[in-house]
Structure formats: C-alpha cells, structure tokens
C-alpha cells in the first residue's frame, strides 16, 4: 500500500468544450486514481478537466498525520481559481470526502469563485464505521485505527479495495497470514486525520441548506463505507432547487470504478449538458 499507482494529479486541457471546466476532488485517504476514468471520459469529449492531489494524500495513510481539513479545501479552491482563468463555466465533482470539500466550495463561492454545478458521489453524511464517530475522544488515547483490522480478506470487496491501492503488477496472496498482517499495519489511519474528516462532515451537514447550486447526488446501494441514507439526507437538506438523486444498484463506494460506472458517466454527461445550458 506504500506505492500508489496513478496517484498523481492530472490535468487535461479541453478542445471542443475547452471553456467548460470540470474540477474533480478525490476522497479521504485516496488519490486522483479513483477519479481518473471519469476524468478521461470527459477529456476525450473535449472538456477541460483538473484533479489535484490533496495535501498529505497519495502515499501511505501514516502521512496524513497532522492534516487539517482546511488544507484540503484550500487545495481544491486553488484549482478552482486556476480553472476559472480559462473556463467560463465550472462543474465540481467530489467523491466521498471530496464531496464534503465540494460542498464547502459551493457554500463559499464569494471567497473561492463561482461554481455552476456540483456532483456528489458517495458523500458521507452518515458513516458506516462507528469507530470513526469516536475519533475525537479516542485520539487522546490511541494514535490511529485500522479500517482493515477486522476485515475478512476472503471477501471480494476487501480484496478489490486492497488491489486498487497496490501497484498494478502486484500479486497478493490473501491466504498468507503474514501478508494480511502487513496490509493491516500499513492501512492504519491516524485518528487526528479522521477527526478532521468528521469536523468537515459536521460543517457540511450544517451548511447544506445554504448550498444552492444545481446538484447531482449519486450513491451506490452496496456502499460499505458511507450509509446510503447519506444521499437521501443530502437530497432533502441541500438548498438547491435543481437537484437530482441517482441510485446505482450494483455499486459500492468508489463509484467511477464500480460496475455501474457507465450509468454514472451518462448521468454526469447529461447533467453537464444541463449546466452548460
């Protein structure tokens, strides 16, 4: 899990629709790799696409120690500002925690710049892992927690998660106890970083009624990280009058890489057309 394939930021200058910019924001502990297929989809159709690597991401989870949620928002805001220099319209797509960052950008447009629409994918209002809810208290007792500590490595979705974060040519023996122990150790996340995620989550929930840009909210029915109730809660609380809720019946958490990705891409394409006018 130390080497992260395709973790680097990516930027594609548009052609046919070069003045329509799409900013993509990855998730907590993730990297631009999880959004690259969606980015390529729109780059191939002539749109300008930018996906920054958020601070303290792209390497092992231990590098997230000491992170502040403001760093993540400011990094995305910088990319938004740069897109605005050449694009007359900008759509922001956020995956998981990236959706929380997206909501902050949409809420603070006077500070960060105009946004013409947002796409929220698997955005966490309600987390499935109850340990995360104890982060603010537990961080004073222990320094980190392991999301894979109790994972069953025989389960396909667990193996899929591990392989996504491994080098492309990695061969992993999921029956080897020493290999599993090493994976669990490397996957441990600093609790102070989880606390920052929860702070950002709390702020986003509180400010949802003040977000009024057109919004597409997408959620996988088989999400093992974020409760599907999150999508419904966002849809009901967000201040946008132009809003859509897309359920993906065969998808888990990282929507651009899930079985329903073609349906997601088509929905975002249609939404882009609506925003473009």
Residue spans for each PLM region:
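Catalytic nucleophile-loop/oxyanion-hole region of alpha/beta-hydrolase
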Residues: 60-91
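Short beta-strand/loop motif that positions the catalytic acidic residue
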Residues: 211, 217-219, 223
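Conserved alpha/beta-hydrolase "acid-adjacent" motif
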Residues: 224-230
């Amino acid at each position: 899990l130390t080497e992260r394939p395709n973790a680097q930021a990516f930027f594609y200058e548009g052609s046919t629709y070069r003045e329509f910019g799409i900013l993509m924001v990855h998730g907590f502990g993730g990297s631009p790799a999880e959004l690259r297929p969606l980015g390529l989809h729109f780059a191939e159709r002539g749109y300008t696409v930018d996906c920054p690597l958020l601070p303290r991401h792209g390497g092992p989870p231990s590098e997230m120690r000491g992170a502040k949620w403001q760093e993540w928002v400011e990094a995305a805001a910088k990319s938004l500002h740069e897109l605005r220099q050449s694009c007359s319209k900008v759509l922001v797509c956020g995956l998981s925690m990236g959706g929380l960052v997206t909501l902050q950008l949409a809420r603070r447009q006077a500070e960060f710049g105009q946004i013409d629409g947002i796409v929220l994918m698997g955005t966490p209002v309600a987390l499935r892992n109850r340990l995360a809810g104890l982060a603010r208290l537990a961080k004073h007792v222990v320094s980190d927690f392991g999301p894979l500590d109790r994972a069953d490595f025989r389960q396909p979705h667990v193996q899929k998660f591990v392989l996504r974060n491994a080098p492309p040519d990695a061969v992993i023996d999921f029956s080897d106890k020493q290999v599993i122990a090493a994976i669990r150790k490397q996957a441990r996340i600093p609790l102070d970083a989880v606390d920052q995620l929860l702070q950002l989550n709390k702020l986003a929930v509180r400010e949802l009624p003040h977000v009024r840009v057109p919004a597409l909210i997408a959620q996988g029915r088989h999400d093992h990280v974020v409760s599907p109730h999150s999508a419904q809660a966002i849809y009901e609380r967000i201040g946008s009058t132009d809003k859509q809720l897309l359920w993906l019946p065969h998808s888990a958490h990282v929507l651009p890489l899930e079985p329903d990705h073609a349906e997601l891409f088509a929905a975002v394409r249609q939404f882009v057309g609506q925003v473009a006018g």
